Amino acid sequence: MMEIMLKAKIHMATVTEKEIEYEGSIGIDEELLELSGIKINEMVLISDVNNGNRFITYVIPEPRGSRKISLNGAAARLVEKGDKIIIMAFGLYSKDEYKSPKILIMNSDNTVKEIR
């Protein structure tokens, strides 16, 4: 049986920008995408720690090393600049192929504190 399991998580990232007049998406620093294994255009679940909002969007890249986490379009109405968010990507796995998720624990400046 195939099951939907957590593939990757960027924990406690800080929202650096929001742009309502945009097509939609979450922009994530390319370095963080590479470290987490989250792909461009991948569907992600976002949880805002400050206000409890949870929503689904897709990923676009932000410049490598910029430390940008930007929410765009309708999703930008659900967060504020400075909010702490959890970004989660999931995959469909068989019991035998699933190992464990890649988890990035973030500092407040969106540098990586720890990788699990």
From Swiss-Prot:
> Where does the record place the modification Pyruvic acid (Ser)?
S25
Pathway listed:
Cofactor biosynthesis; (R)-pantothenate biosynthesis; beta-alanine from L-aspartate: step 1/1
Q: Note the subunit structure.
A: Heterooctamer of four alpha and four beta subunits.
Q: Could you tell me which PANTHER family the record lists for this protein?
A: ASPARTATE 1-DECARBOXYLASE
Q: Which NCBIfam families match?
A: panD (TIGR00223)
**Superkingdom of the organism of origin:** Bacteria
Q: Which reaction does it catalyse?
A: L-aspartate + H(+) = beta-alanine + CO2
Keyword annotations for this protein, in alphabetical order, are: Autocatalytic cleavage, Cytoplasm, Decarboxylase, Lyase, Pantothenate biosynthesis, Pyruvate, Schiff base, Zymogen
User: What disulfide bonds does the UniProt entry report for this chain?
Assistant: none
Q: Does the keyword rRNA-binding apply?
A: no
Any Pfam family the entry gives: Asp_decarbox
Some GO term, biological process aspect, for this entry: which one? Answer: alanine biosynthetic process
- Cofactors (names): pyruvate
The known PTMs are summarized as: Is synthesized initially as an inactive proenzyme, which is activated by self-cleavage at a specific serine bond to produce a beta-subunit with a hydroxyl group at its C-terminus and an alpha-subunit with a pyruvoyl group at its N-terminus.
Main localization (coarse): cytoplasm
This chain belongs to the protein called Aspartate 1-decarboxylase
Record: active site: S25 (schiff-base intermediate with substrate), Y58 (proton donor)
The protein's organism comes out as Fervidobacterium nodosum (strain ATCC 35602 / DSM 5306 / Rt17-B1)
